[in-house]
């Protein structure tokens, strides 16, 4: 920093200079303290602290030097927290790898809690955490509003007196925890919780019961197939839930699903692979639980699972207004989509994503001149149709034409071409689409 720019910044009032320093990472802000005593004092006023040891982990640093570098990092964190004095901490973020002292890390966390931290983000990876209890004070904080815990972190137990009275957002990223006490201890101790994320793509630790009367947004991503015993049943008791992202393996039974307030659901269901035991999923109760949604997004794997495993029959979706549908098998395209349309009498917006892949599956090994139209209920109320990733094949155009003739309420059709299509072909395809006949006299065609 030049002397001119330093002098210019020194003219700023304390409040504005503190704002400038707060926009820098903690280590960058610390380096400015050598410029003047005033800056050193203002640096201590920072209320957002972030420490990340990944910025010191460079390949060119040898193994012998790495211990010294990490010790230097630990000393920096110690000194910075000691420098905080009585100034409150709003946000504390710590990203720290394997080779660390759990006792010292616990002290850092407790220091942040003692300073009334409202946002705590911890990304700790440590094999020693398997035998070390996580600081229990984290689960007794009266100031935490947002808590993020990760990754590959082991939490041996939740304190019986867990109480996070103002916590609104909880994110668990690859965390091992006591699944039995997850709802009746942890969630029960979060009376203000509104947003819950459980992301366990490659790590065990998914509760088979999620129960909360306050959670409005729930995201569950779980792809750890080795944890088989916990896949037989699941319960989602969240009566005030509004938004759900559910990406995991289909279960044998959904024994209690209370989702009566749900408005928006994204389902990404998968078949359990490489399973030695007989395992037959049944998603009937799950589909019944989400039947009142207004917006439904189904991935290609979800449509496959539901088409085969909704053994009690598909419920009516009387409130469904928006449907995003993916699929790539003949059964899904010819049987499940028409059935879902019939069971969605008030649907107004339909989005078909990667239609080319769907048609590849449908027409694989058949004569492309043979057009097998998809049944569209005559009573459909769809007024907006969106086709995403259109490749402009002949069969795609035939199906789009079929939709235009069968959806009499259509007002808007949006066709998003694939990025792989050259501009000259886009021009020709746009002309072809504009010439397609329609049953609706109020139709507008948009090509993107």
Curated annotation (Swiss-Prot):
<dbReference type="InterPro" id="IPR006566">
    <property type="entry name" value="FBD"/>
</dbReference>
<keyword id="KW-0677">Repeat</keyword>
<dbReference type="Pfam" id="PF00646">
    <property type="entry name" value="F-box"/>
</dbReference>
<dbReference type="InterPro" id="IPR055294">
    <property type="entry name" value="FBL60-like"/>
</dbReference>
<feature type="domain" description="F-box">
    <location>
        <begin position="6"/>
        <end position="54"/>
    </location>
</feature>
<feature type="repeat" description="LRR 5">
    <location>
        <begin position="290"/>
        <end position="313"/>
    </location>
</feature>
<dbReference type="InterPro" id="IPR001810">
    <property type="entry name" value="F-box_dom"/>
</dbReference>
<feature type="repeat" description="LRR 2">
    <location>
        <begin position="143"/>
        <end position="165"/>
    </location>
</feature>
<dbReference type="InterPro" id="IPR036047">
    <property type="entry name" value="F-box-like_dom_sf"/>
</dbReference>
<feature type="repeat" description="LRR 3">
    <location>
        <begin position="190"/>
        <end position="213"/>
    </location>
</feature>
<feature type="repeat" description="LRR 1">
    <location>
        <begin position="117"/>
        <end position="141"/>
    </location>
</feature>
<keyword id="KW-0433">Leucine-rich repeat</keyword>
<feature type="repeat" description="LRR 4">
    <location>
        <begin position="228"/>
        <end position="251"/>
    </location>
</feature>
<dbReference type="Pfam" id="PF24758">
    <property type="entry name" value="LRR_At5g56370"/>
</dbReference>
<feature type="repeat" description="LRR 6">
    <location>
        <begin position="421"/>
        <end position="443"/>
    </location>
</feature>
<dbReference type="InterPro" id="IPR055411">
    <property type="entry name" value="LRR_FXL15/At3g58940/PEG3-like"/>
</dbReference>
<protein>
    <recommendedName>
        <fullName>Putative F-box/LRR-repeat protein At3g44810</fullName>
    </recommendedName>
</protein>
